[in-house]
Amino acid sequence: NIPPIATSQGDNIRSTRVGEAVILSTQVIDDGLPVTRRDQTITEDALRRRMMRPPSKLTVQKINGLFLAWNVYRGEGKVTFDPPMPKPWEDTRTAANSPWGALWLPPEIPEDGIYEVTATFDEPGTYILWTRADDGGLYHDDYITVNVTE
């Protein structure tokens, strides 16, 4: 397994206005390891039983699968990402959109390897956004700066 590579497309310093969406395109290259375990044929009844089952391990287990997540590294206000981003930290709640959550499934990988996300800012200021490509075993980060005006 080698780390996936996340490369932000476009300028590393961008400008926008409050309320206007910025398109964040990121190319992700990965070797396909570790292998993703996708159980998409699970029935609703089996899913309900799995949700109610007590943990079987004392340590938190991360679900393997390539994903990309954008987050705010520094900034004054709230940033809304669309689609909503998986959390790159341990959040074990079932519906937390985190690889450590019991029912989380990795999102589909775009055919061309380029993930498209929009970011909308609610306050002016300078924001540093970071993106993480994570395959469940290793990860790679990239950063951009966005200057937001009124």
Each predicted region: which residue ranges?
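Short, compositionally biased P/S/T/A/G/V-rich stretches that sit at domain boundaries
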Residues: 1-16, 29, 34-35
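Extracellular Ig-like/FN3 beta-sandwich strand-entry sites
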Residues: 21, 112, 124-126
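Short amphipathic, basic-aromatic surface patches that mediate peripheral association
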Residues: 28-60
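Solvent-exposed loop segments of extracellular immunoglobulin-like
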Residues: 62-69
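Residue-level recognition of secondary-structure-to-loop junctions
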Residues: 109, 115-123
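Short, solvent-exposed loop/turn segments at the edges of extracellular beta-sandwich modules
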Residues: 134-138
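C-terminal edge beta-strand
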Residues: 140-148
